[in-house]
Amino acid sequence: TTKEIALVLKNGPNDGPVNLNCGSDFVQKNQRAPETPSTRLSFVNQRCASVDGDCDRLVYFSIEEGEEEGKEGENSSKKQNFMLCDGDKLSILIAFFLIEQLFLAGLAHKISLGIAHTAYSNGAFTKFCEKNGVETVCAKTGVKNVHKAAEEHFDIGVYFESNGHGTALFSDEAVKVIEKELVDELTRMSVEQHLRKEEEKHIQSVILTTKLKALLTLKATIQTINPAIGDAISSVLLIEGILRKKGNMPFQEWHAMYRDLPTKQTKVKVRDRTVIECFDSERKCLKPEGLQQRIDEILLLDSCVKNNNRRAFVRPSGTEDIVRVYVEASDAETCEKISTKVEEAVIEFCN
């Protein structure tokens, strides 16, 4: 029926060790489709969900096939464009959908909604949120930190780390407001239908039905999403439901909501990672003294004016003596240059 969601399992039980050449982490970090025996099928123009071995992370991807490459008369193949919707785009889709439903339900002024993220969220994501009036809060790396931020700052807090680990949280108060409004709306509809004339009743019921549908959608979302930290299966059901509610929104349209800036992540081996102290949700470095100033200077290299698309930060690993370096810029070449210089600065200041 039209209410069913058809999910086709692409991998099989004999595909080898869990997460080997597959899973959300493989897809996100390598920017390519899974490569297990059972998945050597065409992903072209298909909307695909990829979860990790213990089903707490989720990313979506698709492959768009373009024009054929190669000269006439030679062996040619069609150019393939890999498209990824990571945790940032999961957050965007869910948050924008819920904002729309709150507006239609007349609850936008009663229930606050926002997105919690980490410093690893792409700069294009945060600018897109700002441009569209979506409130965000940045938390320290780690899903427990983002979960806490979403819970503390918003009545409805949406969060997904870039790797697809996350969920949406509805506060007890938000649930009560939605449920009360739903009961009140059903009561009003019942009364209006008995009191109004047939023509007036028809007009009024159209208005009420729009609100009622939004309230029922919010109620269904609460029942679908798992507020525990990471349940990829319930997240798949929510995403599929949203895409369907949005008129079977094409994957390409979702993916094109904004274009990610090129990024690079590296690790630098150091003698003692604890010499680095960070603040501003790990986006700035407090110690060792002078390192943050050097990073700021590097970001301005080869640029007459400050480039707002350039960003870099360093943070110590939580488990080993390495420093993690994150760099973001308008193009991959600039990313490489900045990353190399930041790595050199880390070695200079931390060894």
Where in the sequence are the language-model features?
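Catalytic-core signal marking the mid-to-C-terminal active-site face
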Residues: 198-221, 242-351
